[in-house]
């Protein structure tokens, strides 16, 4: 019976969309956002009809597994009416000793990122953070903020000018664990 328990548990987790990496105890918190709460105007985009502060939230994480050689952070809106979601922010090659990013780190001009970290182009076409700005009248969108523990120092296919979707694809092969915090925003 014990021989069947592990394969059955793995199968059930796969059906639920979970993985062993998700179950390793990694956590993500923010002083600027609680799980399931509305994102503040401070983080909302300043453009495309939105008038926010466009500041990336402060993020802190813990519980990275042994073998973590770098981190990546993303903010993704799966509710965007594009058919494939919308990438608001992707940062990769964050050094392994890093456990937080300060508020506003997504502004490439401020140079608040740890040395070696790369901010890719978001789906607005700019490098760094682009805050929430869903179409007016849409139901609130879910903004998934995820930190990834990565098994390589530098993602092999992602370069300085990499599109966010390419970085995401590269992360699929190199993620040891991840943690997600979801915020909501609508207008």
Language-model segments: which ranges?
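N-terminus-centered regions that define maturation/targeting leaders and the start
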Residues: 21-187
């Amino acid at each position: 019976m014990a021989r069947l328990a592990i394969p059955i548990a793995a199968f059930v987790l796969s059906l639920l969309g979970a993985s062993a990496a998700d179950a390793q105890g990694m956590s993500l918190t923010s002083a600027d956002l609680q799980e399931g709460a509305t994102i503040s105007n401070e983080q909302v985009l300043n453009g495309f009809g939105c008038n926010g502060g466009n500041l990336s939230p402060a993020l802190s994480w813990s519980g990275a597994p042994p073998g973590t050689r770098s981190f990546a952070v993303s903010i993704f809106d799966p509710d965007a009416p594009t058919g494939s979601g919308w990438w608001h922010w992707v940062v990769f090659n964050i050094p392994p000793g890093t456990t937080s990013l300060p508020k506003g780190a997504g502004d490439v001009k401020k140079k608040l990122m740890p040395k070696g970290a790369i901010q890719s182009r978001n789906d607005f076409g700019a490098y760094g953070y682009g805050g929430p700005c869903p179409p007016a009248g849409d139901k609130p969108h879910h903004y998934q903020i995820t930190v990834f523990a990565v098994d390589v120092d530098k993602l092999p296919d992602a370069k300085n000018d990499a599109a966010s979707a390419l970085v995401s694809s590269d992360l699929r092969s190199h993620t040891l664990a991840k943690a997600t915090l979801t915020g909501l925003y609508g207008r």
